[in-house]
Amino acid sequence: MFMKSLIKLIVFIVLCSLFLHSICGERTIAEMSITYKLTGEITNTNPYSIFVAVPSNITFEEKTLPKPEDFLDVSTSVTQTSGIVFYKTIFNGKEGFWIPPYTTVKINIYHYTPITYDIKIDESQENYDVVGPAVVNKVNVIDLNKLFPDAKYEGIKIGKFKLYVSGYIVKGNDTESLSIIVPAPLVIDNYDEFHKFGDDNVDIWISSYNEWYKNQMERENIHIDNNDPLIPKMDNDVLGDDTHFKFKIFDVPAMAFTTSSNQPIRFYYIIYYKYNN
């Protein structure tokens, strides 16, 4: 009798789980994969040799961009391994570089093992009457000042950095058609230039994610809230009468496309960072 009741309970739990998953579960709509290479120069302006420590595991800071409410929310799960740093030695248990006086050393960080992103949506969103494209609004950022935190205080000058990123986005097997907006997945903080490469006949890039967002708000006749925490604030007394003052807020180019093909959409771009302050 006990076993029959237990079996019924297990069956009931399984059915409930399947039901909840069907209305609240996540579904992978696409996969994105990238590899990157980071190169640059480190200059020792001191009259003596210095050791510059470099983290063995290059980590990213995640930044969030605004998203229109009527577009599909997505979540991403990331699989990542450590990058490979060349020209490295060990000093006091730390990995890094010895740089002679008044000398410039070139640094290379490679990440040949792909970083993969599973792009998922909550299936309950598909029950809405009107649903816009899926929007990824997270960007991984490499902050060179955090990568070399002692640069300003130790007479170290970092500059001429280039970030090479290549990758692809492919539609999920259970997705009939994919319509998506994806900002550049990896950038250098406060970069100076962005150059995209690829098929000129099929240009999937838009120059500014924030401009795209602004256009969507205007299309929906929605005024951007000045109380939005993503918009920086400054006292009016500081601004005075200068109405042309412009804030520099975080923004990156983005990819926007619709596809029903199972072939991957490939992309490649280079980011230039000149010098730290």
UniProtKB/Swiss-Prot annotation:
Protein name (database record): Uncharacterized protein MJ0833
Superkingdom of the source species: Archaea
Organism: Methanocaldococcus jannaschii (strain ATCC 43067 / DSM 2661 / JAL-1 / JCM 10045 / NBRC 100440)
